[in-house]
Swiss-Prot record:
Protein name: Outer-membrane lipoprotein LolB
Quaternary structure and interacting proteins, as annotated: Monomer.
Source organism of this protein record: Yersinia pseudotuberculosis serotype IB (strain PB1/+)
UniProt topology in membrane: Lipid-anchor
Family annotation (InterPro entries): LolA/LolB/LppX (IPR029046), OM_lipoprot_LolB (IPR004565)
Entry annotated with the keyword Acetylation: no
Record's function text: Plays a critical role in the incorporation of lipoproteins in the outer membrane after they are released by the LolA protein.
Pfam families reported in the protein's UniProt record: LolB (PF03550)
Main location: membrane
Chain ranges passing through the membrane: none
Keyword Signal on entry: yes
Sites of N-palmitoyl cysteine lipidation: 22
Signal peptide: 1-21
Length: 207
């Protein structure tokens, strides 16, 4: 009996530790719901950016073609922007100027084309499917018209899924530039049925 009693009391501290370990609450981390006030505040800050410029690296990858270029995006108002793609030598491959109701595209031969649908015009002339209307929002870290998105632990856009006319785009936000206020994306990737668009923003200028 004495031996059993000593053995019993010797196990008590270990049993107490195990029990305590089982009752320690597990931290679930901060809530990052799209309805959280932190996200709403960040979203409002982004929506107020009416004029900005960003430049960096562009890649369009599909089974039919691969395009690598430098890009420059200049937004002068919510409905006016300019997209410039240049080759490694600095020569212009494509310049797109969008204004309300009219879009002008200039190719690498200097030929100009005019349309009222920038996305359709780029696809017909270059073969690249680029969701420009949505990209204006996505490049800032805004979800645009889709309610299907998730946030990271800093209440910034992490991933979104956008569906329109039977086409589904998935956008992954891979890195943010925290040297600007509010923080803006520095790397993101768009995927749609075998097509990939990669954007790396080297710099942001907010006006």
């Amino acid at each position: 009996m004495p031996m059993r009693k000593r053995h019993f009391y010797r196990l008590l501290p270990l049993a107490s530790l195990l029990l305590a370990a089982c009752t320690i609450p597990v931290s679930k981390g901060p809530a990052t719901s799209p309805t959280s006030p932190q996200w709403r505040q960040h979203e409002q800050q982004l929506q107020q950016l009416g004029q900005f410029e960003t430049r960096g690296a562009f890649a369009y990858l599909s089974d039919k073609q691969k395009v690598y270029a430098r890009f420059f995006w200049q937004q002068t108002s919510p409905e006016r922007y300019r997209l410039l793609l240049t080759n490694p030598l600095g020569s212009t491959e494509l310049e797109l100027v969008v204004q309300p109701g009219v879009t002008q595209l200039t190719d690498n031969q200097g030929k100009r084309y005019v349309s009222d649908d920038p996305q359709e015009m780029i696809q017909k002339l270059t073969g690249m499917s680029i969701p420009l209307e949505s990209l204006r929002q996505w490049i800032l870290g805004l979800p645009g018209d889709t309610p299907n998105f998730t946030l990271d632990d800093k209440y910034r856009l992490k991933k979104l899924t956008y569906q329109q006319n039977g086409v589904t785009w998935v956008v992954d936000y891979q890195e943010y530039n925290t040297q600007v206020t509010p923080p803006l994306p520095s790397r993101l990737e768009l995927n749609q049925d075998g097509q990939r668009i990669k954007l790396k923003m080297d710099s942001w200028t907010i006006k």
